[in-house]
A protein has these predicted regions:
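Asp/Glu-centered strand-loop micro-motifs enriched in Gly/Pro and often flanked by an aromatic residue
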Residues: 1-2, 43-48, 226
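Short coil-to-beta-strand transition motifs
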Residues: 2-10
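Conserved strand-loop elements at the edges of beta-sheets that form or border functional pockets
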Residues: 7, 43, 99
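Right-handed beta-helix
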Residues: 10, 17, 51-57, 63-228
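Short aromatic-glycine-enriched beta-strand elements
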Residues: 20-27
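Short, small-residue-rich loop/turn micro-motifs
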Residues: 29-33
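Beta-strand/loop nucleic-acid-binding surfaces
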Residues: 34-50
Length: 228
């Protein structure tokens, strides 16, 4: 009867290409086979998981029923330097998934600062969920959207912003500002251009003739233009 090999054995992935796309990898297992030999090991992963290790990754290899003709790779070994720094925490309250190119999904269960972070390792795009709200960052162009409890802010990398609050909308671009709040539209800029067909309107209020002596606050922009 052939020897049976039970338990886990250290292996190294030498080729992760699989024509059938079933997660089979060629591994070397020096403690069982000659060092130059590679054997096809089937994937033994949790249901719904589809992660194939890169070449030269250290993996754990087992054999179905102890039979060396039926190897399985059942997990990866974390050698020094391979652990995601985002998950290097004690106690281990952070769970992370990281791909070879640096794409990262981090679940932080630290009490009081629970959060989820999704990062594009190539372009530095980020989507973060925290107790304060949700933040989306464009890592390539520098734009940003932040949704908090009291406001939503859209920020262009050049400095222009739009802020949405429960009863106000504010837009800023350089020195120009527009604010809509409590039925009032406030425009602050060195030049204000009105669209075609519009005309400057000066509204003094609804005071009657008998109230003409009352003071009426008036704000006049000397740089208002009407576009015909």
């Amino acid at each position: 009867m052939a020897d049976l090999y039970f338990g886990k054995y250290s292996g190294v992935v030498k080729d992760n290409r699989d024509a059938d796309q079933l997660g089979v990898v060629l591994v070397s297992v020096p403690t069982v086979f000659p060092e130059e030999d590679v054997v096809p090991a089937r994937a033994a992963l949790p249901y719904g998981m589809f992660f194939v290790p890169e070449n030269e990754t250290h993996v754990w290899v087992e054999f179905e029923g102890g039979d060396t003709s039926s190897p399985l790779w059942t997990g990866v070994q974390h050698v020094p330097g391979s652990w995601a720094p985002e998950a290097a925490k004690s106690p281990p309250t952070v769970r992370a998934l990281r791909t070879a190119s640096g794409h990262l999904l981090v679940f932080d269960d630290t009490e009081g600062s629970e959060s989820i972070l999704l990062t594009d390792g190539k372009n530095a795009h980020k989507l973060e969920f925290t107790a304060d709200g949700i933040t989306l960052t464009d890592g390539v162009n520098g734009h940003r959207i932040a949704m908090g409890s009291s406001a939503i802010e859209i920020a262009h990398q050049g400095g222009a912003t739009v802020t949405l609050e429960s009863a106000a909308v504010k837009a800023t671009a350089g020195a120009a500002k527009v604010e809509l709040s409590a039925g009032v539209v406030t425009v602050d800029g060195s030049v204000v251009l009105l669209g075609a067909g519009a005309a400057p309107v000066l509204h003094l209020g609804d005071q009657g003739i008998g109230n003409l002596g009352a003071p009426v606050p008036i704000t006049i922009s000397t740089q208002t233009k009407v576009l015909a």
